């Protein structure tokens, strides 16, 4: 990339919590800035006051930090281009709106919401795409003046609309999609740049902020393509150069084949949801970066530092990115297996406490028992909340045996193995992994039964499961009393 000052931004609205798609936007801007040794700016676009939620901004900031991102400027890191909340920049926008009105490039519009809705319905009934029709079209200056005076007398507050140039093409070379162009007649007519409450709309504020903050590149979601020609018009009207744009592909839900929608509750879509399940931030980050960007080679597991080093915006995909929850689980499992024991212990223990399986502030002996239990299942866990399901046997006893498992117990070898094991267990001095394994080997020697025919009846009889972690370790943690109780119950059932 040619030498230039690189400044990019992530600019969320505090109308909700950090979504997977927004996290991806933040990450791609972050990687671009860090790869080219530029600046990454966090800006809060809170102009839609009615939709902002109380902890929206805090959620965005907390979850971005949890993912491992930091920024050079933002609400919590003031710089020379601040303020970094749009609600605090109203004094910057107003003179520019006044300028456009004075130059005849924007004007006051007094159409009410009811009139606009009626206009749209009429257009739909006529088979037209809804668009704003100039309310002053065909009026003489005197008639226009009277119309405005009547609206003011009725107490109607105006919006400010930008006057869309006619017969003009707006085009740009998109860093992801290639060349894109729009005809000015296709964007829906003159559009609002200032709302009735005096706040600027998104399309106006974002242009002013990006220009004032000297943003060089804008990477954002595909859904912003239609906003770009409107923004290019405003840049042109104010005599400013536009930044370079890159619009990232849609994210598709692999389960439905449809665009990922915040209203689709069939799939978890917010970073906080994954945090609460015990996903690791570096795994989430790894997965999100692969949504629409591909590294060179076959490997898919990289650290953030490695992603920064290898990042190339030319490898951003034009095709929709597939959100595959199973792939996310696989990636997180790779990180869980490689993670420090204490880190997984802390996360999984918290899951057990929150589920009411272990009391708060457990005694040291209980903590040590839980550590062994968690380590037993560590390699199986895709995320640490699974520990609650995986360890059900150790807290609530075994589940009902399914038909396939019952078939394993219906063989001629099952009952002799279980009876021999009961005797061996009864004679053990200490019920630990070493002695349990020795007892099972003694059963093998006594009965001549080995392999699957030896191990499977024991596992099913005591755990009611056909699969699980190492059996001797599992039985030690289950304890002598419960292991013998389950074993004897099965012997009685089969006898």
UniProtKB/Swiss-Prot annotation:
The keyword Nucleus does not apply. InterPro entries: aa-tRNA-synth_I_cd-bd, aa-tRNA-synth_I_codon-bd_sub2, aa-tRNA-synth_I_CS, aa_tRNA-synth_I_cd-bd_sf, Glu-tRNA-ligase_bac/mito, Glu/Gln-tRNA-synth, Glu/Gln-tRNA-synth_Ib_cat-dom, GluQ/Sye. GO terms for molecular function: ATP binding; glutamate-tRNA ligase activity; tRNA binding; zinc ion binding. A motif ('HIGH' region) lies at residues 12-22. Its EC number is 6.1.1.17. Keywords: Aminoacyl-tRNA synthetase, ATP-binding, Cytoplasm, Ligase, Nucleotide-binding, Protein biosynthesis. It is found in: Cytoplasm. GO terms for cellular component: cytosol. CDD domains: GluRS_core. It catalyses: tRNA(Glu) + L-glutamate + ATP = L-glutamyl-tRNA(Glu) + AMP + diphosphate. GO terms for biological process: glutamyl-tRNA aminoacylation. A motif ('KMSKS' region) lies at residues 259-263. ATP binds at residue 262. Belongs to the class-I aminoacyl-tRNA synthetase family. Glutamate--tRNA ligase type 1 subfamily. Monomer. Catalyzes the attachment of glutamate to tRNA(Glu) in a two-step reaction: glutamate is first activated by ATP to form Glu-AMP and then transferred to the acceptor end of tRNA(Glu). This is Glutamate--tRNA ligase. It comes from Pediococcus pentosaceus (strain ATCC 25745 / CCUG 21536 / LMG 10740 / 183-1w).
């Amino acid at each position: 990339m040619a030498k230039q000052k690189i400044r990019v931004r992530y600019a969320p609205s505090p109308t909700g919590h950090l979504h997977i798609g927004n996290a991806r936007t933040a990450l791609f801007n972050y990687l671009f800035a860090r790869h080219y040794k530029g600046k990454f700016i966090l800006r809060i676009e809170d102009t839609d006051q009615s939709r902002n939620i109380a902890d929206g901004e805090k959620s965005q900031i907390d979850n971005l930090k949890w993912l491992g991102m930091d920024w050079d400027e933002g609400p919590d890191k003031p710089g020379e281009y601040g303020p970094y909340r749009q609600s605090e920049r109203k004094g910057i926008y107003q003179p520019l709106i006044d300028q456009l009105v004075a130059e005849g490039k924007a004007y006051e519009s007094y159409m009410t919401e009811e009139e606009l809705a009626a206009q749209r319905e009429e257009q739909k009934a006529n088979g037209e795409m809804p668009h704003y029709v100039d309310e002053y079209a065909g009026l003489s200056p005197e008639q226009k003046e009277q119309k405005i005076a009547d609206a003011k007398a009725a107490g109607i507050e105006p919006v400010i609309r930008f006057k869309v140039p006619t017969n003009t093409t707006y085009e740009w070379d998109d860093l992801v999609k290639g060349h894109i162009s729009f005809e000015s007649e296709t964007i829906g007519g003159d559009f609002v740049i200032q709302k009735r409450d005096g706040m600027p709309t998104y399309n106006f504020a974002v242009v002013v902020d990006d220009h004032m903050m000297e943003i060089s590149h804008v990477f954002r979601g595909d859904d912003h393509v239609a906003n770009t020609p409107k923004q290019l018009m405003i840049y042109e009207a104010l005599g400013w150069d536009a930044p370079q744009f890159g619009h990232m592909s849609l994210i598709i839900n692999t389960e439905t084949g449809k665009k990922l929608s915040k209203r689709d509750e069939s799939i978890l879509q917010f970073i906080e949801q994954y945090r609460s399940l015990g996903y690791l931030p570096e795994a989430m980050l790894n997965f999100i970066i692969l949504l629409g960007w591909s590294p060179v080679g076959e490997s898919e597991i990289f650290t953030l530092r490695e992603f920064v080093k290898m990042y190339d915006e030319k490898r951003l995909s034009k095709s929709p990115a597939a959100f595959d929850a199973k792939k996310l689980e696989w990636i997180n499992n790779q990180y869980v297996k490689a993670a420090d024991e204490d880190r997984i212990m802390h996360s999984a223990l918290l899951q057990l406490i929150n589920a009411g399986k272990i009391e708060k502030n457990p005694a040291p002996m209980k903590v040590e028992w839980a550590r062994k239990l968690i380590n037993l299942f560590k390699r199986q866990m895709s995320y640490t909340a699974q520990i609650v399901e995986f360890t059900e046997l150790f807290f609530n006893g075994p589940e009902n045996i399914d038909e396939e498992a019952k078939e394993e117990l219906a063989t001629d070898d099952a009952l002799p193995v279980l009876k021999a094991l009961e005797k061996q267990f009864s004679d053990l001095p200490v019920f630990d992994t070493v002695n349990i394994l020795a007892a099972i080997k003694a059963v093998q020697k006594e009965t001549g039964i080995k392999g699957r025919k030896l191990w499977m009846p024991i596992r099913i009889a005591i755990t009611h499961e056909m699969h699980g972690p190492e059996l001797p370790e599992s039985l030690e943690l289950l304890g002598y009393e419960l292991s013998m109780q389950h074993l004897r119950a099965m012997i009685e059932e089969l006898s």
